[in-house]
Amino acid sequence: MWFEILPGIAVMGTCLVIPGLATAYIHRFTNGGKEKRVAHFVYHWDLMERDRHISGVNRYYVSKGLENID
């Protein structure tokens, strides 16, 4: 019947989801607890550069928080 295809769809869906989740967790682990940011547009690149300058350690993923910005 039609429901015999459900296990195959579940396996295929799981195989498609695992790489995306693994990538997010690897980026969080390597970038100090934050996901990797991707700049597809110039505006996003400018925001990442601003965060890099504000952090003081030349890394965009290290945030100081608004209360610590001079």
Curated annotation (Swiss-Prot):
Sorted alphabetically, the keyword list is:
Electron transport, Membrane, Mitochondrion, Mitochondrion inner membrane, Respiratory chain, Transmembrane, Transmembrane helix, Transport
GO CC, sorted alphabetically, is: mitochondrial inner membrane; respiratory chain complex I
Naturally occurring in which organism (per UniProt): Varecia rubra (Red ruffed lemur)
Q: What does this protein do?
A: Accessory subunit of the mitochondrial membrane respiratory chain NADH dehydrogenase (Complex I), that is believed not to be involved in catalysis. Complex I functions in the transfer of electrons from NADH to the respiratory chain. The immediate electron acceptor for the enzyme is believed to be ubiquinone.
Q: Which membrane topology term applies here?
A: Single-pass membrane protein
Q: Which InterPro entries match?
A: NADH_Ub_cplx-1_asu_su-1
Self-association state and partner proteins as the record states:
Complex I is composed of 45 different subunits.
Stated name of the protein? NADH dehydrogenase [ubiquinone] 1 alpha subcomplex subunit 1
| Localization annotation | Mitochondrion inner membrane
Query: Which Pfam families did the record assign?
Result: MWFE
> Which chain regions cross the lipid bilayer?
1-21
- Which domain of life does the protein's organism represent? Eukaryota
